[in-house]
Amino acid sequence: MATIPSVVREITLVGEQIFDHTQVVRAEIDRFVERFERNERHREFDGILRASHALVESSETPVEGLFDMGKMEHMTQCVDDITKKLQTLVEPKYQKEHDVYLEKVKEDQKKYVDVCREQAMNKMRSMTAHR
């Protein structure tokens, strides 16, 4: 088992410094700050601060004046216009094209069946006429 004097010799501390962690904590803080700056986390932190300031400013801005000037109505109209445009983009256009295509195929098939039926009738007439 290690004695206090042997521990003091190993870690090169005086007896009073064994429980004083100031140097160790200071070194950890310095290492954290150095890594923080090297990884440019301070820029991200600054961005967060700016965003929070913008939120505070926007929450403190009086909106009654915007309503009185008609800007909110205009903005609402613009949002509604954009919403309508987005909704038309969401509606599948291929469905209409596909329905038109199927209708055309149906008409063409009906015409073909009618032509085949007409030819069959003509053959039957010609066969009965030759008998």
Curated annotation (Swiss-Prot):
Pfam family, one: Muted
GO BP term, example: positive regulation of gut granule assembly
InterPro entries recorded: Bloc1s5
Cellular component, GO annotation: BLOC complex; BLOC-1 complex; transport vesicle
Superkingdom of the organism of origin: Eukaryota
UniProt subunit comment: Component of the biogenesis of lysosome-related organelles complex-1 (BLOC-1) composed at least of blos-1, blos-2, blos-4, dsbn-1, glo-2, mutd-1 and snpn-1.
Family in the record: Belongs to the BLOC1S5 family.
Cited function: Component of the biogenesis of lysosome-related organelles complex-1 (BLOC-1) involved in gut granule biogenesis.
Protein name, UniProt field: Biogenesis of lysosome-related organelles complex 1 subunit 5
Designated gene of the protein: mutd-1
